[in-house]
Amino acid sequence: MSAADMARKNSLINRQLEKEKIDSKKMLKILLLGGPECGKSTIFKQMKIIHMNGFSDLDYVNFRYLIYSNIMQSMDQLLEAAEFFHFPPDDSPSIRRALNHYKSYKVRYSTSEVELNRELADSLSKLYNAEFIKSVLNRKNELKLLDSAVYFLDDIDRISAHEYKPTEMDVLRARVPTTGITEIEFPFKQASLRMVDVGGQRSEQRKWIHCFDNVNGVLFIAAISGYNLYDEDEENRKDDGTPTKTNRLRYSMELFKRIANHQCFSKKTAMILFLNKIDIFKEKIGKYPLTTCFKNYKGVNAFEPACKYVTDRFSRLVSGDIQHEKPLYTHITNATDTRNIDRVFDSCMDVIFKISMEKVGFM
């Protein structure tokens, strides 16, 4: 190879390396973090709808069976709650037949194998409309019930139809716990975004540290609606061996405190908090006082003052030194509302672009 050819080759290599360097500067990494059942995966699905043309036909087939599974899980939760509240099944032959059919189906098939045929759908519909289940639903905000339970069971006829294909709202409502690490990449304005969704279950959280390098923005999702709910903490037990109970919102606060003050996130990493599930919170706050979670709360049990109080409590968890370098940005969200998430995410990206400007050097 002549010297001229070698020079041309080196020039091409250098230009390619420079292009890759520029491209890497334009890639922004966004981390989605939060505890179990906070709505994190729903935000992730919204990004696919808003920025990636939604879902494939195969995705919709998989979501169809996931929705069937969610319906069975919801009915299990309602029947367990009826036992807990001591609400006996209606004394009716049709309800007894429906309950027996449902239980025998559960013996034959696992939740993941469900085919929502007409007979099973009829049994589910009869149970859902029975008086003892209505009594449970009157206290649904006290239960650990799938957020989508009423949504799907209300529409059991549509969902059990042979030609059923999930709508986008069905997909957003479908619940599956995130396990492992899932990534998507999509263009946004003058940059490319890599969004990383990390499993929120307690057993998954030890994996989070592996995703903390070169993060431009953290979206931490906390379900504000969990303020009156408690989960069993299998890792911490009482003297008698029974698990301790942890308030869901308090647990999110502890998690957020660790993340927001973590040394891996420099002053150039935007920290953004989504107080999510405000639709459920609005339903609850007039019935279940905020003092369930915050004993020192002195305000009225109304949406706006309660939201402001929770926002302030989260803000106080971030150290003064960090807040001096970069403020905490908080948004009140409903993850199943596409317009709300589109608007909020646009605002978040303005913040991330601004804070990342010095780091990525392309604005």
Curated annotation (Swiss-Prot):
<dbReference type="GO" id="GO:0005834">
    <property type="term" value="C:heterotrimeric G-protein complex"/>
</dbReference>
<keyword id="KW-0807">Transducer</keyword>
<feature type="region of interest" description="G1 motif">
    <location>
        <begin position="29"/>
        <end position="42"/>
    </location>
</feature>
<feature type="binding site">
    <location>
        <position position="178"/>
    </location>
    <ligand>
        <name>Mg(2+)</name>
    </ligand>
</feature>
<feature type="region of interest" description="G2 motif">
    <location>
        <begin position="170"/>
        <end position="178"/>
    </location>
</feature>
<protein>
    <recommendedName>
        <fullName>Guanine nucleotide-binding protein alpha-11 subunit</fullName>
    </recommendedName>
</protein>
<dbReference type="InterPro" id="IPR027417">
    <property type="entry name" value="P-loop_NTPase"/>
</dbReference>
<dbReference type="GO" id="GO:0031683">
    <property type="term" value="F:G-protein beta/gamma-subunit complex binding"/>
</dbReference>
<feature type="binding site">
    <location>
        <position position="335"/>
    </location>
    <ligand>
        <name>GTP</name>
    </ligand>
</feature>
<keyword id="KW-0547">Nucleotide-binding</keyword>
<feature type="region of interest" description="G3 motif">
    <location>
        <begin position="193"/>
        <end position="202"/>
    </location>
</feature>
<dbReference type="InterPro" id="IPR011025">
    <property type="entry name" value="GproteinA_insert"/>
</dbReference>
<feature type="binding site">
    <location>
        <begin position="197"/>
        <end position="201"/>
    </location>
    <ligand>
        <name>GTP</name>
    </ligand>
</feature>
<dbReference type="GO" id="GO:0007188">
    <property type="term" value="P:adenylate cyclase-modulating G protein-coupled receptor signaling pathway"/>
</dbReference>
<keyword id="KW-0342">GTP-binding</keyword>
<feature type="binding site">
    <location>
        <begin position="172"/>
        <end position="178"/>
    </location>
    <ligand>
        <name>GTP</name>
    </ligand>
</feature>
<keyword id="KW-0460">Magnesium</keyword>
<dbReference type="GO" id="GO:0008340">
    <property type="term" value="P:determination of adult lifespan"/>
</dbReference>
<dbReference type="GO" id="GO:0005525">
    <property type="term" value="F:GTP binding"/>
</dbReference>
<comment type="subunit">
    <text>G proteins are composed of 3 units; alpha, beta and gamma. The alpha chain contains the guanine nucleotide binding site.</text>
</comment>
<feature type="region of interest" description="G4 motif">
    <location>
        <begin position="272"/>
        <end position="279"/>
    </location>
</feature>
<feature type="region of interest" description="G5 motif">
    <location>
        <begin position="333"/>
        <end position="338"/>
    </location>
</feature>
<feature type="binding site">
    <location>
        <position position="41"/>
    </location>
    <ligand>
        <name>Mg(2+)</name>
    </ligand>
</feature>
<dbReference type="GO" id="GO:0001664">
    <property type="term" value="F:G protein-coupled receptor binding"/>
</dbReference>
<dbReference type="Pfam" id="PF00503">
    <property type="entry name" value="G-alpha"/>
</dbReference>
<keyword id="KW-0479">Metal-binding</keyword>
<dbReference type="GO" id="GO:0007186">
    <property type="term" value="P:G protein-coupled receptor signaling pathway"/>
</dbReference>
<feature type="domain" description="G-alpha">
    <location>
        <begin position="26"/>
        <end position="363"/>
    </location>
</feature>
<dbReference type="GO" id="GO:0007210">
    <property type="term" value="P:serotonin receptor signaling pathway"/>
</dbReference>
<dbReference type="InterPro" id="IPR001019">
    <property type="entry name" value="Gprotein_alpha_su"/>
</dbReference>
<comment type="similarity">
    <text>Belongs to the G-alpha family.</text>
</comment>
<comment type="function">
    <text>Guanine nucleotide-binding proteins (G proteins) are involved as modulators or transducers in various transmembrane signaling systems. Mediates the transduction of food and serotonin signals, which modulates the avoidance response to the odorant octanol. Has a role in lifespan to promote longevity.</text>
</comment>
<feature type="binding site">
    <location>
        <begin position="34"/>
        <end position="41"/>
    </location>
    <ligand>
        <name>GTP</name>
    </ligand>
</feature>
<dbReference type="GO" id="GO:0003924">
    <property type="term" value="F:GTPase activity"/>
</dbReference>
<dbReference type="GO" id="GO:0046872">
    <property type="term" value="F:metal ion binding"/>
</dbReference>
<feature type="binding site">
    <location>
        <begin position="276"/>
        <end position="279"/>
    </location>
    <ligand>
        <name>GTP</name>
    </ligand>
</feature>
<dbReference type="GO" id="GO:0005737">
    <property type="term" value="C:cytoplasm"/>
</dbReference>
